[in-house]
Amino acid sequence: MEEILIWIKKLEKYLYALNAKVAGIPLYKIIIASAIMLFTLILRRLIAFLIVKILTKLTIRTKTDVDELIVKAFVKPFSYFIVVFGFYLSLLVLEVPKVYADKFLKTFSLLILGWAIIRFLNLFHNKIVEFFVKVGGKDFAEEVGDFILKILKAFVVVIVGASLLQEWGVNIGAILASVGLLGLAVSLAAKDTFENILSGLIILLDKPVKVGETVKVKDFMGSVEDIGLRSTKIRTFDKSLVTIPNRDIVNNHVENFTRRNKRRVRFYIGVVYSTKREQLENILKEIRELLKEHPGVAKDEKFYVYFENYGDSSLNILIQYYANTNDYEEYLKIIEDINLKIMEIVEKNGSSFAFPSRSVYIEKMPKS
């Protein structure tokens, strides 16, 4: 009995102690608030895990994996939100004015939301790169992906920052006006950069050139080595690397040799003036037959073989046809084979190629 009385007296002392106040706050409220904080700190990961498990089961049923990225991006921020919410409840228990507790909750909720969105953008970056790899190559895709990621992140930071300022009663109208003027100044200073970036995106979508193609832009001709966000690199035939701003490619005529399905060949041959009419007619006829039968000559294009004019030292024959290839080496092989056969035709018909010559006639020999 005495032991029970002793325990009751201890309990009375304990209950009396709970009525005590610390900084004007009842001790029992401090204990409850501390318990809430401890509970959320211990169970935040468990709660987040259970919610993520439920959401994951739902996302598996969908065809896209974007929702899986969203869950993956938001799981860690959500666990921190649980702690913030527990702290918010603790503030209410401690009788902190609700207006300040609400501001605390909204402030950290915005920060956590912004963090979660940026985490999602980092994960989604690979998707952006994969999309642009299909149309512009790996290097270009990574550059475009990084650029888009930075723009989106900056947008998120601006929106979250503006929302926080507005939540704390800061007039963002004046700030936006100042930012607008600053943005105008920056945009004017970076006009060329933005123009090149926009042109890079146009090149990506319109595809006037691709890596590996042989092109001519302005006075530069060569193979495209790289298409960047701001410039395109062309390796000329003398192995010089030329960097051309993307806006110059968009604003100028681009001749793409790789996309030609055939190449035109046009030249003149000159035979000597001693060539008889019958010989010349036979030469023209046999060259036409050669071009008609040659496998390297495009059959869907007209060819021309005509005695066109009288030169200073030769009878000039125009020869024009289309080589049925866009490969440069194959193109040269076709030209070489046809040229050798033309040489045989001229020699077979008893004529020869003329070369510039001048005859000097002396009417009277000078007296010695």
From Swiss-Prot:
<feature type="transmembrane region" description="Helical">
    <location>
        <begin position="104"/>
        <end position="124"/>
    </location>
</feature>
<feature type="transmembrane region" description="Helical">
    <location>
        <begin position="144"/>
        <end position="164"/>
    </location>
</feature>
<dbReference type="Pfam" id="PF21088">
    <property type="entry name" value="MS_channel_1st"/>
</dbReference>
<dbReference type="InterPro" id="IPR006686">
    <property type="entry name" value="MscS_channel_CS"/>
</dbReference>
<feature type="transmembrane region" description="Helical">
    <location>
        <begin position="74"/>
        <end position="94"/>
    </location>
</feature>
<dbReference type="InterPro" id="IPR045042">
    <property type="entry name" value="YnaI-like"/>
</dbReference>
<dbReference type="Pfam" id="PF00924">
    <property type="entry name" value="MS_channel_2nd"/>
</dbReference>
<feature type="transmembrane region" description="Helical">
    <location>
        <begin position="168"/>
        <end position="188"/>
    </location>
</feature>
<dbReference type="InterPro" id="IPR010920">
    <property type="entry name" value="LSM_dom_sf"/>
</dbReference>
<keyword id="KW-0472">Membrane</keyword>
<keyword id="KW-0812">Transmembrane</keyword>
<comment type="similarity">
    <text>Belongs to the MscS (TC 1.A.23) family.</text>
</comment>
<protein>
    <recommendedName>
        <fullName>Uncharacterized MscS family protein aq_812</fullName>
    </recommendedName>
</protein>
<feature type="transmembrane region" description="Helical">
    <location>
        <begin position="22"/>
        <end position="42"/>
    </location>
</feature>
<keyword id="KW-1133">Transmembrane helix</keyword>
<dbReference type="Pfam" id="PF21082">
    <property type="entry name" value="MS_channel_3rd"/>
</dbReference>
<dbReference type="InterPro" id="IPR049142">
    <property type="entry name" value="MS_channel_1st"/>
</dbReference>
<dbReference type="GO" id="GO:0055085">
    <property type="term" value="P:transmembrane transport"/>
</dbReference>
<dbReference type="InterPro" id="IPR049278">
    <property type="entry name" value="MS_channel_C"/>
</dbReference>
<dbReference type="GO" id="GO:0005886">
    <property type="term" value="C:plasma membrane"/>
</dbReference>
<dbReference type="InterPro" id="IPR023408">
    <property type="entry name" value="MscS_beta-dom_sf"/>
</dbReference>
<keyword id="KW-1003">Cell membrane</keyword>
<dbReference type="InterPro" id="IPR011066">
    <property type="entry name" value="MscS_channel_C_sf"/>
</dbReference>
<dbReference type="InterPro" id="IPR011014">
    <property type="entry name" value="MscS_channel_TM-2"/>
</dbReference>
<dbReference type="InterPro" id="IPR006685">
    <property type="entry name" value="MscS_channel_2nd"/>
</dbReference>
